[in-house]
Amino acid sequence: KEVEKHPEKDEIREAARKEVQQWIDMQIGVSLSPEERAKVENDPSIVILNAKMVYKRKYTFDPETKQEYFLKWKARMAVVGTSEVAGLDLVWSTFSPTVGFAAIRLMMACLCNPKYTVGSYDMTGFFLGAEMHDRTVYVRLPRDAVGQEGVVLRLLRAAYGLRSASRDAIAQLAKLILSFEETIAHEDGDRVFKFHKLAVEHCIFRYVDSL
C-alpha cells in the first residue's frame, strides 16, 4: 500500500521485478501446483513462512564534489524467519557470522608480507542460493513480488531471512574452498584458508560475505 502512494512507485516496482527475476534465475524455489498448494495449506503440521520485500535507496559517492548522489532503488525479498520455531523448524544451532581476532592478526601479518598480492571481493548474493540442509521450507511471496504475487514456493536454496541461511552459505563456501588441492583450514575454522596452486601460495580470509 505504501508503495502505491510513493512518488517513485514505478522505480520501486522495477527494483522489485529485478529481485523476483533473480530468485527465478537462481532457482531459489519451485512454485507449487494448485493441488500441491491446497494440500500444503490444509496440512496443520506444515508452516508456510511469509516473505516481504525490503526497499533501500542506493547512493554513489562523487570524489570530485565529495557528495553522495542517489543511484537507484534496491529491493530485497526476505523470508520472515521469526516465524521459524526452534526445535521444530530448526533442529540445529544457528549463529550470526563474526570475525575472529586470530584471523585479523593473521591477515595483518600477510598484508605486511611483500610476497602477497592483495585483493578484496564482495560475494554478491552470498546468503541467497546456498544449498539447504535436509528440510523442506515453504514460502508465500508478498503482494509486491511483481508477477509472482501470493505464489507459494518450496525452497530449494537458502533465502535471505531464514535463520539457517548464514550457516548454509558458509558451509557451502568452506566445502568449495576445501575441495581445492592442498587446501588447509587454519584454527579459525571456516574463516581462514590456505592453499597452493601453480606453485603459488594463496591465503583466503572470509568475513561474512567478503573475501
Residue ranges and their predicted role:
Residues 1-199:
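Chromodomain-type histone methyl-lysine reader module
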Residues 1, 208-211:
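Short, intrinsically disordered, charge-balanced linker/junction segments flanking boundaries
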